[in-house]
């Protein structure tokens, strides 16, 4: 059976697993305990993944085996029957957002055939991304943010003042923000959740033209699977703060520590991307409870055919 067909057969079960994680985390929205919210999502997602007919392996997860008791890198999930699948996940993207009752918290999981996702260490990653419909090579991580803004504006036939760039709100990004604004472009700051930021470039209604900045490498691979599904562009480079992080990268098999990865190296084969809203956000609505029922909204993307679906599910509370 083809890779695309295998992933298609897993899609609805993947949605169910992400929904379960989102619902579990939603019980802790606004309660100020991000660790408890994350653990609730982890427990529910792991249960859902283990019910799926696949030989699954976590390649992007909650950390190394000695750091995370569940959904650790290398953990095998699924029933043990079916296709060999690599999985990247973030059971609760936006733990702080959830704890504070803020927007854009998601339960996120991606699937690809074995070997189809970059085995990225849990370090930082410099990233730049745009959505579909732009000339190949329009962005370059080695150019300044302002030069990339100019290139995008030129490709779209608009002024740089019409370009909006999404950046995580971090002190380390102050120079990036200043450079973007120096050419008149607008900056939308995200308090947390750079998977959401990257994916926003693919959805016209968000008004986001480009994402740039430094965030987690695992989140970079997750976001890359979504972009691959819809034809966006992305470049990334691992960023190491110390020798321990370099050693961690070597352990995952990365040889060239300065390599600039393009989208097809981050996610090299057919992909399935699933994100269920925990709190209301730009991509999907959050979990809602009303009149004895629970409703969820899930964004699902498939690289085969560049298919994007929104699935709304209602179940008894």
Describe the predicted segments one by one:
Residues 82-93, 97-118:
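DPxDG-like acidic metal-binding loop motif
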Residues 143-293, 297-302:
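An extended, acidic
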Residues 17, 21, 103, 218-222:
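Catalytic-loop motifs flanking and including active-site residues across diverse enzymes
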Residues 77-78, 107-110, 207-211:
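Short basic, glycine-rich beta-strand/loop surfaces that mediate nucleic-acid
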Residues 1-88, 147-150, 154, 195-196, ...:
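N-terminal subdomain of lithium-sensitive/metallo-dependent phosphomonoesterases centered on the IMPase/IPPase/PAP
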């Amino acid at each position: 059976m083809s890779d695309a067909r295998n992933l298609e057969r897993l899609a609805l079960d993947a949605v169910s697993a992400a929904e379960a994680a989102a619902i579990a985390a939603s019980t802790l929205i606004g309660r100020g305990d991000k660790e408890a919210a994350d653990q609730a999502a982890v427990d529910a997602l792991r249960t859902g993944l283990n019910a799926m007919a696949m030989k699954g392996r976590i390649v992007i997860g909650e950390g190394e085996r000695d750091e995370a008791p569940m959904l650790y890198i290398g953990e095998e999930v699924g029933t043990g029957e079916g296709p060999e699948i690599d999985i990247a996940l973030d059971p609760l993207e936006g733990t702080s957002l959830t704890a504070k009752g803020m927007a854009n918290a998601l339960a996120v999981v991606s699937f690809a055939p074995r070997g189809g996702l970059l085995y990225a260490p849990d370090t930082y990653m410099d990233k730049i991304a745009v959505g579909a419909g732009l000339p190949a090579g329009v962005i370059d991580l080695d150019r300044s943010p302002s030069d990339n803004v100019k290139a995008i504006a030129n490709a779209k036939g608009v002024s740089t003042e019409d370009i909006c760039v999404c950046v995580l709100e971090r002190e380390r990004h102050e120079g990036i923000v200043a450079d973007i604004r120096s050419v008149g472009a607008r900056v939308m700051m995200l308090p947390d959740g750079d998977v959401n930021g990257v994916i926003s470039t693919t959805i016209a209604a968000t008004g986001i033209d480009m994402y740039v900045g430094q965030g987690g490498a695992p989140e970079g691979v997750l976001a890359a699977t979504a972009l691959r599904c819809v034809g966006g562009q992305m470049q990334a480079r691992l960023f190491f703060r110390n020798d321990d992080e370099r050693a961690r990268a070597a352990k995952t098999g990365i040889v060239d520590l300065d390599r600039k990865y393009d989208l097809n190296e981050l996610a090299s084969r057919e992909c399935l991307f699933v994100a269920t809203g925990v709190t209301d956000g730009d991509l999907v609505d959050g979990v809602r409870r009303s009149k004895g029922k629970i409703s969820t909204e899930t964004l699902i993307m498939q690289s085969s055919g560049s298919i994007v679906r929104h699935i709304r599910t209602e179940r008894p509370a």
